[in-house]
């Protein structure tokens, strides 16, 4: 379920704000979205894995807080990011 180093590098390069950026809110949201998607697939196959479900809820809460921060900073950046990630319908 953990992200491979190669996949992390792909996500970072796609969402980084500048060349050495590895921890901006955009990158963090993209990483969390990837982890959430993988964990959701796992939970569809393993319905009784309650500890993973709790972890999923924690990840969703963390992503929600980061998205709120991005929304406060720049509404346009927020709209572009959620459209790019395909979240929030």
Swiss-Prot record:
CDD domains: Ribosomal_S15p_S13e. InterPro entries: Ribosomal_uS15 (IPR000589), Ribosomal_uS15_bac-type (IPR005290), uS15_NS1_RNA-bd_sf (IPR009068). GO terms for biological process: translation. The keyword Ribonucleoprotein applies. SMART domains: Ribosomal_S15. Pfam families: Ribosomal_S15. SUPFAM superfamilies: S15/NS1 RNA-binding domain. It comes from the Bacteria. Transmembrane segments: none annotated. GO terms for molecular function: rRNA binding; structural constituent of ribosome. GO terms for cellular component: cytosolic small ribosomal subunit. Keywords: Ribonucleoprotein, Ribosomal protein, RNA-binding, rRNA-binding. HAMAP family: Ribosomal_uS15_B. Part of the 30S ribosomal subunit. Forms a bridge to the 50S subunit in the 70S ribosome, contacting the 23S rRNA. One of the primary rRNA binding proteins, it binds directly to 16S rRNA where it helps nucleate assembly of the platform of the 30S subunit by binding and bridging several RNA helices of the 16S rRNA. NCBIfam families: S15_bact (TIGR00952). Belongs to the universal ribosomal protein uS15 family. This is Small ribosomal subunit protein uS15. It comes from Nostoc punctiforme (strain ATCC 29133 / PCC 73102).
């Amino acid at each position: 379920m953990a992200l491979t180093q190669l996949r992390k590098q792909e996500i970072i390069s796609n969402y980084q704000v500048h060349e050495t950026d590895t921890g901006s809110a955009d990158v963090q949201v993209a990483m969390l979205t990837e982890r959430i998607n993988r964990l959701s697939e796992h939970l569809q196959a393993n319905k009784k894995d309650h500890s993973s479900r709790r972890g999923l809820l924690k990840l969703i809460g963390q992503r929600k807080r980061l998205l709120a921060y991005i929304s406060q900073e720049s509404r346009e950046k927020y709209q572009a990011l959620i459209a790019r990630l395909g979240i929030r319908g």
